[in-house]
Amino acid sequence: MKIALIGYGKMGHMIEEIALQRGHEIVCKIDVNNPQDIDSPEFCSADVAIEFTNPTAAYGNYLKAFSHNVKVVSGSTGWMKDHKEDVEKLCADGKQTLFWASNFSIGVAIFSAVNRYLAKIMNGFPQYSVCMQETPHVHKLDAPSGTAITLAEEIIDNIDRKKDWKRGVTYWTEDGHHDEGDANITDEDLVINCVRDGEGPGIHAVMYDSDADMITIEHSAHSRKGFALGAVLAAEFTANHSGLLTTSDLFKF
């Protein structure tokens, strides 16, 4: 496949390495220094663009790629609140393709399946209270992360006593300051606490606590390699699939 990269930071470099190892060609690399190249012949020749940028840039990047009929794989988060319906319409009515996921790691896809299954079980045991904690790297812009929100929404969909998620305490270990999070948290809210610590790719944990015991499931990333491989697998998936896609389309479990 001919692949364009939108965003050439640490993730972009890792995606490039894995894509080349799997026999693909990188035809264009777009970063903050050359945003105009998204209109270049090289970009337009791509079968798919893999986009990892930020919440403010992502939607505009999708529109640019779609205008050139280039499919998009994206791991950017934080844009869905304002633009989800627009993207759904573009993929349905405009026949465009976006494979979006808050996390492309195969391990997180498996963790997500376990999370959904456990939530269905715990729906019948109201003596257990559920909460979440995530520990991404200190540079992560959104708190909670898109991955944490996706996991929380899966729990809410399967546990009747939870109606919404709320941001709990966010703590930065580097300088010790913290943010108390959302006000007016009730028993119907699933609290997501965040710890910003170091340079690690991320830890996500779901805890079910009762007077008798605690059940915890956790995913810990050792590197960005798992995310990058998943993004390339998603790009390969778009060769024969179109529309609005996500990891549940790619991983059938």
How does the language model describe each region?
Residues K2, K10-F43, G124-F253:
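C-terminal substrate-binding/catalytic lobe of Rossmann-fold NAD(P)-dependent oxidoreductases
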Residues S76-L98, A109, V114-Y117:
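Rossmann-fold NAD(P)-binding glycine/threonine-rich loop
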